[in-house]
Amino acid sequence: CHPDHYREWSVSPHAYAQLSPVFNSMQATVLAITNGTNGDFCVRCHNPVGMNLGEPEFMSNMDRHPTSREGVTCIVCHRLNRAYGKLSGRLAIVEGDLFEPVYGPKGGDELERVIESGEYRVNTERGKAGRAIHTKAEKFFQLSTSGFCGTCHDVNLVNGFRLEEAFSEFKNS
């Protein structure tokens, strides 16, 4: 349904957040340096789906759920309905299948138009013919703000070391 968005995501760092050899090497180094005391510090941003599924922090990617291996997918942002601020990736993704509501910066006007038009042959009910589609898109203003991304894109280690400052750099540019 969103081929351009999918194509952009599929070659982005978000798509490789959990599978990246650089990430996995860095995480292994941090684990070794801290004797494993960093817990879920890295994976809660690199694998929020796995965290919400209750997967262990230290687990082979081969043993993870296929969706968990996809890194930061659409649902990581579009299934959040609360503003978290800077919580270092501790996000509670609203669970559900394709038919459950999604959240976005614009709300549901376009979705309603697509559903009502009949042109797209979409289906909002399980077991019915047609392309399955979300039943509702609710407005989530925070998704349209740059601060939303700061939840994961400012990384301060427990000793105060600023590992990544992407959001702060953007904010101060």
Regions found by a protein language model. Give the residues of each.
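Sequence context of c-type cytochrome heme-c attachment sites
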Residues: 3-70, 81-144, 150-173
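Elongated alpha-helical scaffolds
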Residues: 73-76
